[in-house]
Amino acid sequence: MIVLTRRIDESDTITGTVTLDVDSRIKSRLRVTLDDGREAGLMLERGHLLRGGELLADAAGSQVVRVLAAPEAVSTVRCSDPHLLARAAYHLGNRHVPLQIQPGLLRYQHDHVLDDMLRGLGLAVEAEQAPFEPEAGAYQSAPHSHSHAHDHPFVRLPAHS
């Protein structure tokens, strides 16, 4: 089995591709089947959403695999009115919905309840199959810490009454 342990920026040779939905692309440890049928394991650092087009390599750099974002069931809102689109983004964000944001477009994993809510705001919602690339904040794909320059060797738990 190929073990992919690191992300790389570029490579002259791509030895395979793997097509993954967003739920698989948020995992740092995962057994996958490459598009050519070979087995591979992802052993990556945590806290990073894999994006379509990213390159993964094994420790030696002899295997380089391109990640492809799989088409999946999504709801897409297209709107030329920025105020209406901002209202939709506000209501979806208030519900902590992972959201793909592009000029004139919002996309989220298909949910008929959310579709109906947005239609109630006057937006047209289309259910479709498309790659889903949500904003990084939904999955903390940037380094994140709660550190503030000193350690807490022990955590005090609240007393139970």
UniProtKB/Swiss-Prot annotation:
The gene is ureE. Keywords: Chaperone, Cytoplasm, Nickel. Belongs to the UreE family. This is Urease accessory protein UreE. GO terms for cellular component: cytoplasm. It comes from Pseudomonas putida (strain W619). Pfam families: UreE_C, UreE_N. GO terms for molecular function: nickel cation binding; unfolded protein binding. One of its GO terms (biological process) is protein folding. InterPro entries: UreE (IPR012406), UreE_C_dom (IPR007864), UreE_N (IPR004029), UreE_N_sf (IPR036118). It is found in: Cytoplasm. Residues 133-161 are annotated as: Disordered. Involved in urease metallocenter assembly. Binds nickel. Probably functions as a nickel donor during metallocenter assembly. Its main location: cytoplasm. It comes from the Bacteria.
